[in-house]
């Protein structure tokens, strides 16, 4: 696992990959500087992690987070570093944020993108492939990143996104819509490669 200790800031000086309107890399920018009132399109990822029973790990963003503090969301999100394989970035970020190892990592929504504006005007503007994986064990989250976590039933979370979208992160709500009525996403991904 990561050498990071609880409460340790991670990736503070990371660069994110900027994208042109055709979603091609066109430069880099510091992660902390890129998110603002006029956030440029950039590359990110989201992940949905499941336990051995098929339950989804949902997390509540720490209250000190710059964007959407205290909001419930999918398992983990982040940004690949310039030149970094996105699947490896998912594994790196999950280890840093949740101190979890993964198996059966698959990209479920390779073309997902969204733009959302928070109540304070901060904008997310991301091409954000969505990954699913099986988590090994329970998380031990970095409190600077995650204030709470729960294992929940997939269908219950999908229904919550439909019934109370204001209670979840906007990207997670949009991703649940993109998953649609399909079967459990990890099962579907494993079946597709199997």
Curated annotation (Swiss-Prot):
KW Cytoplasm (keyword) present: yes
Using the chain's own numbering, where are the disulfide bonds?
Answer: none
- Provide the active-site residues from the annotation: 77, 126
Task: List residues traversing the bilayer.
Answer: none
**GO terms for molecular function, please?**
isopentenyl-diphosphate delta-isomerase activity; metal ion binding
Give the required cofactors. Mg(2+); Mn(2+)
Q: Known PROSITE patterns for this protein? A: NUDIX
Q: Which GO terms describe its biological process?
A: dimethylallyl diphosphate biosynthetic process; isoprenoid biosynthetic process
Named in its record, the pathway it takes part in is: Isoprenoid biosynthesis; dimethylallyl diphosphate biosynthesis; dimethylallyl diphosphate from isopentenyl diphosphate: step 1/1
Q: Where does Mn(2+) bind?
A: 35, 42, 79, 124, 126
Q: Which residues bind Mg(2+)?
A: 97
Entry's EC annotation: 5.3.3.2
Question: Where does the record place it?
Answer: Cytoplasm
Tell me where on the tree of life, at the top rank, the source sits: Bacteria
Q: Where is the Nudix hydrolase domain?
A: 40-174
What are the UniProt keywords, alphabetically? Cytoplasm, Isomerase, Isoprene biosynthesis, Magnesium, Manganese, Metal-binding
Q: Which family does it belong to?
A: Belongs to the IPP isomerase type 1 family.
Q: What is this protein called?
A: Isopentenyl-diphosphate Delta-isomerase
Task: Tell me the organism.
Answer: Frankia alni (strain DSM 45986 / CECT 9034 / ACN14a)
Gene that this polypeptide is encoded by = idi
């Amino acid at each position: 696992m990561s050498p990071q200790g609880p409460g340790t800031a991670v990736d503070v000086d990371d660069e994110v990959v900027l994208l042109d309107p055709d979603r091609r890399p066109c430069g880099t920018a510091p992660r902390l500087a890129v998110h603002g009132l006029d956030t440029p399109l950039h590359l990110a990822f989201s992940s949905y992690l499941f336990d051995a029973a098929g339950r989804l790990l949902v997390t509540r963003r720490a209250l000190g987070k710059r964007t959407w503090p205290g909001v419930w969301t999918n398992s983990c999100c982040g940004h690949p570093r310039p030149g970094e394989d996105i699947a490896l970035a998912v594994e790196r970020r999950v280890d840093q944020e949740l101190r979890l190892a993964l198996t059966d990592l698959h990209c479920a929504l390779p073309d997902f993108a969204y733009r959302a504006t928070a109540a304070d005007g901060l904008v997310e503007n991301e091409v954000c492939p969505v990954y699913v994986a099986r988590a090994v064990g329970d998380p031990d989250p970095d409190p600077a990143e995650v204030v709470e976590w729960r294992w929940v039933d997939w269908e219950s979370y999908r229904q919550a996104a439909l019934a109370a979208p204001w209670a979840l992160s906007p990207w997670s709500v949009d991703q649940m819509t993109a998953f649609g009525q399909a079967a459990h996403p990890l099962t579907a991904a494993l079946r597709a490669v199997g």
